[in-house]
């Protein structure tokens, strides 16, 4: 649904892929639990290729140098104020396929908790944000837990998986995941991220 206050008869402007991040690795760890909280994992930018002109929108870093896309107020100012967007579909950026599937699930679960508590339930802008619940296709039971936990949140609109996979996504080991997505009424979005495996 379109947020209250939108102009009647106006076609809403929806940004369908807004990348959001935690403020730092330390910030992300605040949403994690042991034994994973103290484990090592890659930084967001470890495997990125530098883009000509820079990776981020100018002025998008937080006031204390936080990652761009980590502050709901700054993102809202750019999207809803400067660009005239009505609804933003948020896609938390993870670390792709991890060698330890349980660590991978813990990282994505932390992103989901951050997404809901910091963005979707934001007192001022939450109504304009929609969320992508990130799940780990390498850990189906962990993925199903995340879907069950968040699928009834009114602002969750899709499930997100990395584009890369160790196996083709049509294979039987993924069927429980797709069936859970159908049962929840949530489409599945793919997004390229760091990691090793088969890329489409």
Spans of features found by a protein language model:
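Helix-coil boundary/capping segments in enzymes
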Residues: 1-200
């Amino acid at each position: 649904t379109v947020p209250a206050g939108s102009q009647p008869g106006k076609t809403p402007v929806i940004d369908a892929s807004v990348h959001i991040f935690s403020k730092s690795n330390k910030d992300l760890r605040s949403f994690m639990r042991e034994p994973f909280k103290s484990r090592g994992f890659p930084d967001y930018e470890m495997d990125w290729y530098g883009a000509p002109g820079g990776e981020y929108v100018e002025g998008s870093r937080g006031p204390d140098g936080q990652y761009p896309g980590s502050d709901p107020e700054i993102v809202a100012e750019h999207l809803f104020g400067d660009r005239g967007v009505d609804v933003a579909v948020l896609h938390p950026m993870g670390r792709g396929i991890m060698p330890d599937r349980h660590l991978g699930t813990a990282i994505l679960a932390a992103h989901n908790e951050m997404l809901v508590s910091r963005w979707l339930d934001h007192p001022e802008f939450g109504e304009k944000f929609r969320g992508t619940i990130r799940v780990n296709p390498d850990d189906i039971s962990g993925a199903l837990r995340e879907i069950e936990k968040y699928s009834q949140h009114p602002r969750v609109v899709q499930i997100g998986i990395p584009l890369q996979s160790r196996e083709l996504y049509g294979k039987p080991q993924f069927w429980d995941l797709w069936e859970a997505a159908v049962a929840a009424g949530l489409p599945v979005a793919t997004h390229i991220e760091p990691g090793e495996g088969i890329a489409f």
